[in-house]
Amino acid sequence: MKVIAINKKARFDYSLIDEFEAGIVLLGTEVKALKYHSASLNEAFVAFRRFELWLNNMHVPPYKPASRFNHVPTRSRKLLVHKRQLNKISGAVRTKGLTLVPLSIYVNENGLIKVKFALAKGKKKHDKRQDIKDRDWARKQARQDFS
């Protein structure tokens, strides 16, 4: 598994409930640009549209050798999931306060580009502060164990 892009802020801003994997519908120039490890998930989000999952605002920069036949960098891209998973996800998203957040894009062992996304609930500011305190405390304990 070769990771192309990671959404680092997702784990900090949201508490993740359940993770899913999906295929993604891409154009040829997008595939080539992604294979060069150039993508950004910082502003990306997953949304439902007509009983389908769509990945919005993922930035894939233009593939330089393609010149005028390039893609639109932030276009919406369809995610491919099984119908059973789609029903489970749609039921969960209807719950107040839950959203779908993309976590990473990677190439699996078969050479297919996949998106890992999660069902998540937004954290409040005090939750984020508590996470930072817990992380610092764990680091301090790990240092003391080595001493």
UniProtKB/Swiss-Prot annotation:
GO molecular function: RNA binding
Biased composition regions of type Basic and acidic residues, renumbered to the chain: 128-147
Single GO BP term: trans-translation
Subcellular localization: Cytoplasm
Main localization, broad class: cytoplasm
Pfam families reported in the protein's UniProt record: SmpB (PF01668)
Purpose: Required for rescue of stalled ribosomes mediated by trans-translation. Binds to transfer-messenger RNA (tmRNA), required for stable association of tmRNA with ribosomes. tmRNA and SmpB together mimic tRNA shape, replacing the anticodon stem-loop with SmpB. tmRNA is encoded by the ssrA gene; the 2 termini fold to resemble tRNA(Ala) and it encodes a 'tag peptide', a short internal open reading frame. During trans-translation Ala-aminoacylated tmRNA acts like a tRNA, entering the A-site of stalled ribosomes, displacing the stalled mRNA.
Protein name per UniProt: SsrA-binding protein
Species: Neorickettsia sennetsu (strain ATCC VR-367 / Miyayama)
Taxonomy of the source species: Bacteria, Pseudomonadati, Pseudomonadota, Alphaproteobacteria, Rickettsiales
